[in-house]
Structures are given as C-alpha cells and as structure tokens.
Amino acid sequence: MADKEVYDDAVEERVINEEYKIWKKNTPFLYDLVMTHALEWPSLTVQWLPDVNRPEGKDYVVHRLVLGTHTSDEQNHLVIASAQIPNDDAQFDASHYDSEKGAEFGGFGSVSGKIEIEIKINHEGEVNRARYMPQNPCIIATKTPTSDVLAFDYTKHPSKPDPSGDCSPDLRLRGHQKEGYGLSWNPNLSGNLLSASDDHTICLWDISGAPKEGKIVDAKTIFTGHTAVVEDVSWHLLHESLFGSVADDQKLMIWDTRSNNTSKPSHSVDAHTAEVNCLSFNPYSEFILATGSADKTVALWDLRNLKLKLHSFESHKDEIFQVQWSPHNETILASSGTDRRLNVWDLSKIGEEQSAEDAEDGPPELLFIHGGHTAKISDFSWNPNEPWVICSVSEDNIMQVWQMAENIYNDEEPDTPASELEGQAS
C-alpha cells in the first residue's frame, strides 16, 4: 500500500511540474502582470491594504499587503509587505519576456516589480487569518492556533520584532474555546468583529469601547446555531446587523444581531453536500451571496429565496476554501482551494452557447483559470485599487500578484493564435 502511495505521489508531482511548465510558457499571452515571490515561510492569509502610494516620477505604484507566517516551530509574525506594481506609464512587451528567467525572477510584466517585507510583529503561533478594520486599517485582527483572537495596531509596534519573541497584542478577544479561521469586520459599524471557530460558535466583539488598561475584551454575543466546526463568517456589506456563517454541518445561516435569539438564525439552509468552507456577499447587489464547499462547487444564493440555489459553479477538482467577489465588477467572483487553481467566474456568461471544444475546458461562466501555483492555495485577495489584480498565496511559500490579460475580460480576440494557448484561459 505504501509503495503505491509513493508511486502516486511521484506521478502527481510530475504532472504538477509539467502543468507548471506549460503555464509558465504561456504567461505572456495569458497575463498583463505576473509577479512571483517566495516568502521565507508560507502565509495562510493575504489581504491588500486600502492605501496606495504613488511615488513621483516612477513608473510604479506601491501597494501594501497583510500577511502572516506558518513556521515549523520557529517564531511566527504578522507581516506587512509592500508590492511595487507597474503603472500605465510602464511599457511592457511580451516579446521581451525572458522565458529562461521566467517567474522566479519576478516574471512577466514586472520590470519594476518588487515585493518587500516592511513590518514584522511577533505572533503567538501561526496566523490562521489576518484582516484589517475598514474604518481604521492600522488595526488588524488575527486568528491564532489558540482560542484567543488578537488585535494589533501596527503603528504602535516597531517594524523589527522584539528578538525575545514576546507577543504583545493591543487587545486579546476572549470567548472561543478553540481555534478557527473565519474573521470579519463590520464595514458599517466600527469596531464590530465576528469570528468563527472549531468550537461550533461565532463570537461578536465590539472593540470601540475597549478597556485601555486590561487589554482583554470578552465577547459581546456568542451565536450557537451550528452543530459542527464553523468555517467562515461574513458581515453583510450594506446592512449593519446582518451576517452569514457557514460550517461543516453543510449549512449556510443568516443572522440578525437585533434578534434576541442567539441560538437560532433568521435563516438556515442546507447549502452543499459536504462541508461549507467560505462565503462572500456581493458588494453591488444586496441580495446576492456565494458559498464555497468541500463538494468542489461554488453556490450562488439570493437572500430573498434561500430555498432555491440560483446556480452551482462547477470546475474545481477538489475542496474550495476561499471565495471572493470582485470589488470592481458586479458579476465577477473568484474561488480557490486544494486543487492549486484559482478560478475567476463571470455570472453574465451563465447559459451562453459554447462549442464542444470550449465546453471541454469548462462551463461558459468560467472566465479564467490561474494555474501558477503548484501547491494548495490558502487565501487570495482582490486588489481594491487596481481592477483585475489579485494576490494569491499557497502552502509552498509562494505569493503571486497577477492580472489576467485585458482581452480575456474584454471579450476581444487575443493577439496570439489560439493554437499557442494551452488550456489555461477558457
């Protein structure tokens, strides 16, 4: 049995390497930007910060990212990194792409592309997830391997971590019994933070009136409707009292903080045929949300009629762990997970006619497959300032900042004969 596993692993590794070579060869035709950076340790989390710095006289703009570390028994850190992204003045030409250097040296389109670590703050154990507070992006909440949720104001910490390894968060949020991943700041109520946990509960804290001395904040409310690990939680983007949660009990639940019943959601739906790992509310359409599952599908929902699943997006070959709507386009969402692929979907193409050849690559709503990762994708983030730019991080320390070629989302014909494109863009 063990021999077969070793053989299967070797075959899989060879397939992954072959696919990666094909992907790399085709990057100039499929992308307007690809930057690949090997982090010292893998990050389980990534989120673009909302600020942009535009240095005068340069052909790039500087964006910043929140990352974490997942080390092997070494000191862990909450990390702020910067990425130089070429602006419209920067000129690229696919023919200048050095295929030998390829993605290892920054890759296609990143003449000036640099990724640098700016701030490292000591953290207790790996950073399961880190998210900034929209009303004050200096404040970042993190999920740890313990039951505590931590909050850091990164302006109050030195950019180089204390060598002692002491972790001194500005606040410690208590209420869970176990670790977890889900974390969501309320975009409409400053300081209101939700967290999902393996202990089957969701905690809500309000840190706006947090103690200045004690540093410990107890949960304001604990929601107990799920009967298994709660994987993710998200506030509605327009209604300050509504949020959604998903769990290993295969359910999607919609909650209203105005309700006195913290054990019964206002809506509960059997969303998938396996664990539900993630959810995302559409930023433009107040009734629409998406969920991603271990059943390999992304489901589309309408809050006005949750009994009926609007659509199921099918193309992933393994568990889905992250789903996020584009901040710039109402019909665009992306999903990623264990199959090492990040899929970008376009709702407006659902039901379009396809040739038999196109159908082999995936359904018409599958706009693009990002094939640059050779390990499970842990998290990704749409850039809020640069349309179509995504940062994705995988378990093998790789972080990629990329933007698909404009002709793909503008429905134009590529400049390249189709015969040269090998099965990545559909």
Swiss-Prot record:
Keyword vocabulary terms for this entry: Chaperone, Chromatin regulator, DNA replication, Nucleus, Repeat, Repressor, Transcription, Transcription regulation, WD repeat
UniProt repeat feature WD, residue ranges: 47-123, 129-174, 182-218, 229-270, 276-313, 319-370, 377-404
Subcellular locations according to the entry: Nucleus
Keyword hit for Manganese: no
SUPFAM superfamilies: WD40 repeat-like
InterPro entries in the cross-refs: G-protein_beta_WD-40_rep (IPR020472), Histone-bd_RBBP4-like_N (IPR022052), WD40/YVTN_repeat-like_dom_sf (IPR015943), WD40_repeat_CS (IPR019775), WD40_repeat_dom_sf (IPR036322), WD40_rpt (IPR001680), WD_repeat_RBAP46/RBAP48/MSI1 (IPR050459)
Superkingdom of source: Eukaryota
Family: Belongs to the WD repeat RBAP46/RBAP48/MSI1 family.
Subunit structure, interactors included: Binds directly to helix 1 of the histone fold of histone H4, a region that is not accessible when H4 is in chromatin.
Function: Core histone-binding subunit that may target chromatin remodeling factors, histone acetyltransferases and histone deacetylases to their histone substrates in a manner that is regulated by nucleosomal DNA. Component of several complexes which regulate chromatin metabolism.
The protein's name: Histone-binding protein RBBP7
Natural source organism: Danio rerio
